[in-house]
C-alpha cells in the first residue's frame, strides 16, 4: 500500500508527539518542520486536521504547541490512514 505525502506527514507528526510525550513543554510546529524538513504551512494544516479529529490537543501563544490527546498506544494507525 502506498501512502500519500499528506498521510506520511500526518504519521510523522503523531510519532514525533508520541516520542516527546514526557516533556514539560509541548511540541511546536516549527520543531517538527525543522526535524523532518517539511514546510510549516503544510504542517499547520495537518495539525488543524488532527486537532479537529481529536488526536491532538493544541495550545496557541507563547509556550503553546501540541500534545497527543490520548496515549500513543490507543491510537490506531489504520484509523489515521483512513482519515487522511
Give short role names for the model-derived ranges.
Residues 41:
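Key DNA-contact positions within bacterial/archaeal DNA-binding proteins
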Residues 47-48, 77:
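Short, hydrophobic-biased segments on the C-terminal half of alpha helices
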Residues 72-84:
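Conserved segment of winged-helix/HTH DNA-binding domains
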